[in-house]
Amino acid sequence: VPRLIDHNERRELLAEATWRVIVRDGVAGASVRTIAAEAGQSTGSLRHIFPTHAELLAFALKLVIERATARVAALPPRPTAVETVQEVAAELLPLDRDRRAEMEVYLALFTAANADPKLRVPRDEAHLRMREGARWMIAQLDNGADLAPGTDRELEAARLHALIDGLAAHLIYEGAAADPSWARRVLARHIGSLAG
């Protein structure tokens, strides 16, 4: 007996198929027909869940953010604020196959939003959530008395956000075969430098 899947699960399966197509063929290759074939669905079935291509791409981007947020929330507590922030920040980097695929999709759709107004809302939301995450990390350092006195929290949140984005872009550029451990060291050095 085939297992029935609910509407939300189908949405996620279609978004994951979208990710695979984007990683393999880029956003330009992510047509409704190609995504439906990747998911083993008819185009009509896909359109029943996502009436427009833009809605599918927007949901695919939102799912990247939801998955990253869930991973961060599931991290075990660390003994110090510095260790907590290092682990949270590292979780946002493409350090393994799954996170690498998510980051490739994130960057591709982030860029595609410049030409597609329907992707701008989820792109802007993703950017805002990243900035809020960076603010939270700086607040953790401050609350743990690990932030140097007189530190401009907003400026440091912007720097941390930019560092995470930059490291992620470099890791994607270097390819999956490259050793990503250097990025963890850069992150640890930066976060350590914020401590007073």
Q: Model regions: which residues?
A:
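Generic hydrophobic, amphipathic alpha-helix propensity
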Residues: 7-18, 35, 60-64, 68, ...
